[in-house]
């Protein structure tokens, strides 16, 4: 049995969260790839919910397009990466347009490219030097209540110091 470190920070949290997971996916039409950070709440043994800020995250747009095509979106979640990759992954619209590879920001900060490797169970890439990687698929036409297991009404504490509401539109 393997366990993943996923803290529940306060009694109001929706559940245990994987923090600073670098989500990596490829656009189903264009082949353009991207890396972003998202709220990842453990919902069950083999299920994570992922919150895409509407209109603001590139992988959210990729998941929406895959859903339009009736396809699952393969995704890797790399945890424990170089801080330059975490910084680069924070560049989102409108700073960087859809199709811009934020890993190039990380590469510029590091003065060397970010190495990728093939996933073992899904057709996607992952950050090669991560401490560990979770592989999976974003499922089309399925949304879950973020706090479906705790019913607290909240998600998790955010960096500005507040706890936001749980989303009813998290992807699985």
Regions found by a protein language model. Name each.
Residues 1-172:
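Extended, highly charged
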